[in-house]
Amino acid sequence: LDLPDSAIDSFKKAIWRVIEANTEAFAPHVLSHANSLQRIRNRGIDCRTVIDVGASDGRWSQMARSFWPDAHYHLVEAFEHWNGALQALTADDPRMTFTLAAAGAEDGETPFTNSFDDPFGGTAMPDAGAPQWTVRQVSLDQEVERLGFEGPFMVKLDTHGTEREILAGARRVLESCEVLVIEMYNYGEDSRRFPAMCQHVESLGFHCIDMGEPMFRDHDRAFWQVDFFFVRKDRPEAVYPQFR
């Protein structure tokens, strides 16, 4: 089909008018994780081991694998609801493993809250409310040492409030970490909201380089959460201060 340039331009403008009129609906797709990871991969950043914390059924790791196909993917998930899906995903794949546990500052146990009505909403925050039970907890440093994983690492956290504790238990991993992907929030305790969390992650030696999938809450369409992508502070993208 051979269309004139004027028709193609009109079509593009019409599409953008639709997107601009429905920014909340389209933002997570335009600013998708896949697009962010593609940009990071295009920068030549390599990862040997990807640690996916809050992995649910493994869909994020499967998506990331299209950009780092030779990496080993280790999934950490606390909610036993996902055990069957993770077993099926990793059964015949030596480059994909999982641990059924929460991640935290140290090995042990932790309270955990989730609901089968919302299996993507789990948290190990102790004041999260019912239903709550005790699950195994691992630190990423100990997990990596136990399983013999090697960097460079990518670490992704979708953990609903326990990011500081998980990072505290990953000091050695962070020394060899090239990419951090962290879901951050606009509500809750100030120290766990995205402004303070971005400062905290920068204090650990990283610089925010991308973002993805902003979400607006149902209650009043206020900004709720977004995923930030961090690289090491000494990378060229982090050091260069100009727009052009």
Could you tell me what each predicted segment is?
Residues 1-244:
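Phosphate/nucleotide-binding beta-alpha loop and adjacent structural elements of enzyme active sites
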